UniProtKB/Swiss-Prot annotation:
Organism: Escherichia coli O157:H7
Gene: agaA
Class of the enzyme per the UniProt entry, highest EC level: hydrolase
Protein task: Catalyzes the deacetylation of N-acetyl-D-galactosamine 6-phosphate to D-galactosamine 6-phosphate. Can probably also catalyze the deacetylation of N-acetyl-D-glucosamine 6-phosphate to D-glucosamine 6-phosphate.
GO MF annotations in UniProt: metal ion binding; N-acetylgalactosamine-6-phosphate deacetylase activity; N-acetylglucosamine-6-phosphate deacetylase activity
NCBIfam families xrefs: nagA
One Pfam match: HutF_N
Sequence positions that bind a divalent metal cation: E125, H191, H212
Residues annotated as catalytic: D269 (proton donor/acceptor)
Protein name: N-acetylgalactosamine-6-phosphate deacetylase
Superkingdom of the source species: Bacteria
């Protein structure tokens, strides 16, 4: 089946094309071509690659860790509403048996498919952290790194485990990083008190970047650059960024752009309160409170976010001054490259999957097509 989507402006990796159309065949972009002069209708103001959210714990009142049959479908529809065409359900620190169960459910969803945004695999955030910058993760459940245990996680996930987060100062971390990379698993560094030197050693071992840059890690000091300094200055490192203006000050967001504009991966780190009213929710098994859209633990620490990807894109434009094209790439092309799926996702290009979002001039989501099919909200 072939159909055409026409836009006043269409975003490619190279930039905007005015008055162009996508020709889509069997869920794949077959061609990008000028709209015939005789055709005046447009399907969208802006056609862009659908967003990829690589770090999602929950939303719409549900959590990835919930053992219920419709949780991932509900979350996938929630993500599609914010312009996300594909995503990684993300686990949290919990008993190993609970993590295994979540990874199995995610693997099953990958295999069977379903409504909404496509599930690309899983992201393991915890239990391989250290206590100093634990965030909302319960330190009593932190575990040591063992190759056999990592292999078991990969096996339980039926090889759908895409990302493992860990603290690079843990014993055995460098060996674990090398092993995970051999298994084609990405490694992100976070919830850690690592030094600049320890972080650089982890990048040398193959680690891919930082978990929500600035949050849950050693900050930048002029005599001890810490994890943030290592990430900002190492061109090998992808930098996850929660661009809600609460987790990271706009000036620090701008600094990230100055140092690493081509390496920023916009994430939501969203938890079950995303898209919901203020009130009490749970994260990592603990009660948290959302007020004014900001979620905090009982001790006052930030506990995940309620951010949407489309809002993150708008925030980057408004708060840091990057162009709309640059911000959109941070939420599409960059995460695709980080995951190694940029051959099929992340930009509008012939041969890639037709994962497409229509935006208005204010970068608000109007419609989304996932593998060429219009998603209904």
């Amino acid at each position: 089946m072939t159909h055409v989507l026409r836009a006043r402006r269409l975003l490619t990796e190279e930039g905007w094309l005015d008055d162009h159309q996508l020709r889509i065949a069997d869920g794949v972009i077959a061609a990008i071509e000028p709209i015939p002069v005789s055709v005046t209708e447009r399907d969208a103001e802006l056609l862009c690659p659908a967003y990829i959210d690589t770090h999602v714990h929950g939303g719409a009142g549900v959590d990835v860790m919930d053992d219920a049959p419709d949780v991932l479908d509900k979350l996938a529809m929630h993500k599609a509403r914010e312009g996300v065409g594909s995503w990684l359900p993300t686990t949290v620190t919990a008993p190993l048996s609970t993590i295994h169960a979540a990874l199995k459910r995610i693997a099953q969803r990958c295999q069977r498919g379903g409504p909404g945004a496509q599930v690309l695999g899983s992201y393991l955030e915890g239990p391989y952290f250290t206590p100093q910058n634990k965030g909302a993760h319960p330190p009593e459940l932190f575990r040591e790194l063992e190759i056999a245990e990592l292999d078991q996680l990969i096996a339980v996930s039926q090889h759908t485990l895409r990302v493992v987060a860990l603290a690079p100062e843990k014993e055995g971390a460098l060996q674990a990083i090398r092993h995970l990379k051999q298994q084609n698993v990405r490694v992100m560094l976070g919830h850690s008190a690592a030094t600049w030197q320890q972080t650089r050693a982890a990048f040398d071992a193959g680690a891919d970047g930082l978990v929500h840059c600035y949050n849950g890690m050693t900050g930048l000091h002029h005599r001890e650059p810490g994890m943030v300094g290592a990430g900002l200055t190492d061109k090998r490192a992808w930098l996850e960024l929660i661009a809600d203006g609460h987790h990271v000050h706009p000036a620090a967001m701008s600094l990230c752009c100055c140092c690493a504009k081509e390496r920023i991966v916009l994430i939501t780190d969203a938890m079950q309160a995303a898209g919901m009213p203020d009130g009490r929710y749970t994260l990592c098994g603990e009660e948290v409170q959302m007020h004014g859209g900001v979620v905090r633990t009982a001790s006052g620490g930030l506990a995940g976010s309620t951010l949407s990807v489309d809002a993150a894109v708008r925030n980057m434009v408004e708060l840091t001054g990057v162009t709309p094209a640059e911000a959109i790439h941070m939420a599409s092309l960059h995460p695709a490259r980080m995951l190694g799926v940029d051959g099929v996702l992340g930009s509008l290009k012939p041969g890639k999957r037709a994962s497409v979002v229509a935006l208005d001039s204010g970068l608000h989501v109007q419609q989304i097509w996932i593998q060429g099919q219009l998603a209904s909200f």
